């Protein structure tokens, strides 16, 4: 898929993911975060393919990608998937952690999900991501917050 083929919703989702990892709001992310972002978005890929593409797109070898470069790179890995099917998969994943069926999961469960998606995340990175998602500090994440985090919607 090319950047031109991305829907407005996909670009918004990727912007949200990019911003989540651009913690200092410098306008770029480090190339080592790309695989984490792709996994968070539920994309599968060969690590070697990703590294080769990063080398191509990060031509100056700075290890930093601006949003347009990130968009070019991630567009190649995005699989066109029915939005409803993706939402259903996420709903199912949420239900697995919402053991009591009360409509929310503790942030500790969210931490497990994020760690499962990328085992290279540090405790500080996990804390920052959870703080961004659990904006009211309740220690829980409801399905809407979970969906917003996972899809940018």
UniProtKB/Swiss-Prot annotation:
SUPFAM superfamilies named in the record: EF-hand
Protein keywords: Allergen, Calcium, Metal-binding, Muscle protein, Repeat
InterPro entries the UniProt entry points to: CALM/Myosin/TropC-like, EF-hand-dom_pair, EF_Hand_1_Ca_BS, EF_hand_dom
Binding site for Ca(2+) 2: 134, 136, 138, 140, 145
Residues binding Ca(2+) 1: 58, 60, 62, 64, 69
Molecular function GO terms recorded: calcium ion binding
A Pfam family annotated for this UniProt entry: EF-hand_7
Gene3D superfamilies with a match to the protein in the record: EF-hand (1.10.238.10)
Ranges where the EF-hand domain occurs: 9-44, 45-80, 85-120, 121-153
GO CC list: myosin II complex
Family: Belongs to the troponin C family.
Protein's UniProt name: Troponin C
């Amino acid at each position: 898929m090319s950047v031109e083929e991305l829907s407005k919703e996909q670009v918004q989702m990727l912007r949200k993911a990019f911003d989540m990892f651009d913690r200092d709001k410098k306008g770029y992310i480090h190339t080592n975060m790309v695989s984490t972002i792709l996994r968070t978005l539920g994309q599968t890929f060969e690590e070697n393919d990703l590294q080769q593409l990063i080398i191509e797109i990060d031509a100056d070898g700075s290890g930093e990608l601006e949003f347009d470069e990130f968009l070019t790179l991630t567009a190649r890995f995005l699989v066109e998937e029915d939005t409803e099917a993706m939402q259903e998969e996420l709903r199912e994943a949420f239900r697995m952690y919402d053991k009591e069926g009360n409509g929310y999961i503790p942030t500790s469960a969210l931490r497990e999900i994020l760690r499962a998606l990328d085992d290279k995340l540090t405790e500080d990175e996990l804390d920052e991501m959870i703080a961004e998602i659990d904006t009211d500090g309740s220690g829980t994440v409801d399905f809407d917050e979970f969906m917003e985090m996972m899809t940018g919607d």
